[in-house]
Amino acid sequence: MGPPKIGQTVVVEVPSTTANIGPGFDCLGAALDLSNQFTIKRIEGNAERFELIMESTEGNHLRGGPENLFYRAAQRVWRTAGVEPVALEARVKLAVPPARGLGSSATAIVAGLVGANALAGYPLPKEKLLELAIDIEGHPDNVVPSLIGGLCVTAKTATDRWRVVRCDWDQSIKAVVAIPSIRLSTSEARRVMPENIPVNDAVINLGALTLLLQGLRTGNEDLIADGMHDKLHEPYRWGLIKGGLEVREAAKAAGALGCAISGAGPSILALCKATKGREVSVAMVKAWEAAGVASRAPLMSLQLTGSECISNTFG
């Protein structure tokens, strides 16, 4: 297939994600109904030209150029497919705030993959895009649900290949995500984790993950409450989130079934019945306010479609 023509434009929407969801460290993630929109255009210039236009003050620190995640993902698609690379412009309507534990980096990677694949005439199947996304990100729990939607478990098999399973999520269970004004980088959140963990902690997490998945499948409140329990990463990370433990306890007191750090944080995920959503949201915001941190806590639903190319036109 030939390279995209100058002026060709695609529009890609990519959902936010909440990863880990308590015990599913680096393997469990869910797409949520808050999305970034990327308008991607072939422009004149050599293949190393990449212009990034952010339509949000949240993204003012982000830059174009060859090190940009979006650009790197687009280049991987074209190299893999044998398509001549081209200069690009990406205009981003940013709804997913960076460095908050909602998969903002994953949206950039997925948008680069999906957008470049669309511009080139879809030479690569979605399975290949999944493989590339995991390789670029380094772990699957955000990029997989961001690409395909839903609640996803991703595991590496004994033959060193990735297997993805989409799991059921009962529609009566909603997610309240408290998003603070403070930031926390994934690299910082990973630095505090130990290199080795006790076997007993791993066993506890295996059991908790099983309970959580069954609870989400059936809507069983007790199973969800017992399953939202982690020993692998959260004990080391709560100390990085100002007021985080108080927000967690406030959410539970207001009716949340369980709470977890969303991804690497600092956002906090609470699972609850829809009827408890407003109470949980208000309680989390007030608890963070008491700690001197501004926040918002929208009630979210599972996003089932994943990333979508909603337009492919010539300018």
Swiss-Prot record:
Localization annotation: Cytoplasm
Transmembrane in keyword set: no
Protein name per its UniProtKB record: Homoserine kinase
Database matches in InterPro entries: GHMP_kinase_C_dom (IPR013750), GHMP_kinase_C_sf (IPR036554), GHMP_kinase_N_dom (IPR006204), GHMP_knse_ATP-bd_CS (IPR006203), Homoserine_kinase (IPR000870), Ribosomal_Su5_D2-typ_SF (IPR020568), Ribsml_uS5_D2-typ_fold_subgr (IPR014721)
Catalysed conversion reaction: L-homoserine + ATP = O-phospho-L-homoserine + ADP + H(+)
Positions annotated to bind ATP: P97, P98, A99, R100, G101, L102, G103, S104, S105, A106, T107
Superkingdom field: Bacteria
Enzyme Commission (EC) number: 2.7.1.39
Alphabetic keyword roster: Amino-acid biosynthesis, ATP-binding, Cytoplasm, Kinase, Nucleotide-binding, Threonine biosynthesis, Transferase
PROSITE patterns linked: GHMP_KINASES_ATP (PS00627)
Known pathway: Amino-acid biosynthesis; L-threonine biosynthesis; L-threonine from L-aspartate: step 4/5
Family: Belongs to the GHMP kinase family. Homoserine kinase subfamily.
Functional description taken from the UniProt entry: Catalyzes the ATP-dependent phosphorylation of L-homoserine to L-homoserine phosphate.
A GO-annotated cellular component: cytoplasm
EC category: transferase
GO molecular function annotations of the record: ATP binding; homoserine kinase activity
